[in-house]
Design a protein with these regions (language model features):
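Acidic, proline/glycine-enriched N-terminal capping motif
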Residues: 1-154
Length: 154
């Protein structure tokens, strides 16, 4: 863990963005149990987290101890029902992915930051600014773009 001046980490993961799954509760043999499902939107959440960590390490992530801000940009493939034959959005289609099945922005953010805990920062209390954007991937591949920078850097 280090204190690094002018810390900046920026990377992209070309994969379908996944929201952090909600904890589930079950009773097994009379004992309550809390667990987080691994299957999210038909994909392995653990594999998704490993993809994020691998991209961050490749981009030079260090577990720093400085005030940080994060920007997460999630680009998702729109359902075919929203597209014309030429691949553009229908005029009746919503511009941004806001349906419940598209996932909550805060859960996308939580999935990324939880994956990077201890890899790109020491504790999530270091974040003083957070931003998440969800948009359709019409002109490029779906994926997530992550930028984490020390507060005060331009």
């Amino acid at each position: 863990v280090k204190a690094v001046e002018n810390y900046l980490l920026s990377f992209e993961v070309k994969t379908k963005p996944l929201p952090q799954p909600r904890p589930r509760f079950a009773t097994i043999a009379g004992h309550p149990r809390v667990y987080t499902p691994n299957n999210v939107m038909g994909r392995s959440f653990n594999l998704y987290k490993k993809e994020i960590v691998a991209a961050a390490v490749k981009a030079g992530a260090e577990a720093v101890v400085v005030p940080l801000e994060a920007q997460i940009r999630c680009r998702m493939t729109p359902p075919r029902s929203l597209l014309r034959k030429d691949g553009t959005l229908k005029s009746s289609a919503r511009t941004y992915p806001i349906a419940q099945r598209d996932g909550d922005g805060d859960n996308f953010l939580k999935a990324v930051l939880d994956s990077l805990l201890g890899i790109a920062f020491k504790d999530d209390s270091q974040f003083v600014g957070l931003s998440v954007t969800k948009e359709w991937a019409l002109d490029s591949e779906e994926g997530i773009h992550v930028t984490i920078r020390e507060v005060g850097l331009a």
